[in-house]
């Protein structure tokens, strides 16, 4: 899998959800960690 972003040194993949405290405030949808609104939970390797 290709990593979209790293949090705590862990890969975040397409379709993941990022926390508000994630670097750059990233959240994600199925296109990757790029959406501008917050989503619940996280999905790491």
Swiss-Prot record:
The modification 4-hydroxyproline is found at residues 23, 40. The modification 6'-bromotryptophan is found at residues 37-38. Its main location: secreted. The keyword Cell membrane does not apply. The keyword Transferase does not apply. Disulfide bonds join 3-16, 11-28, 18-33, 27-39. It is found in: Secreted. One of its GO terms (molecular function) is toxin activity. It comes from the Eukaryota. Expressed by the venom duct. Keywords: Bromination, Disulfide bond, Hydroxylation, Ion channel impairing toxin, Neurotoxin, Secreted, Toxin. GO terms for cellular component: extracellular region. The cysteine framework is XII (C-C-C-C-CC-C-C). Mu-conotoxins block voltage-gated sodium channels. This toxin reversibly blocks voltage-gated sodium channel in cephalopods, with no alteration in the voltage dependence of sodium conductance or on the kinetics of inactivation. This is Mu-conotoxin-like Cal 12.1.2g. It comes from Californiconus californicus (California cone). The lineage of its organism: Eukaryota, Metazoa, Spiralia, Lophotrochozoa, Mollusca.
């Amino acid at each position: 899998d290709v990593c979209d972003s790293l949090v705590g040194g862990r890969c975040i993949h397409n379709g993941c959800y990022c926390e508000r405290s994630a670097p750059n405030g990233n959240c994600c949808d199925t296109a990757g960690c790029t959406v501008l609104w917050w989503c619940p939970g996280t999905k790491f390797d």
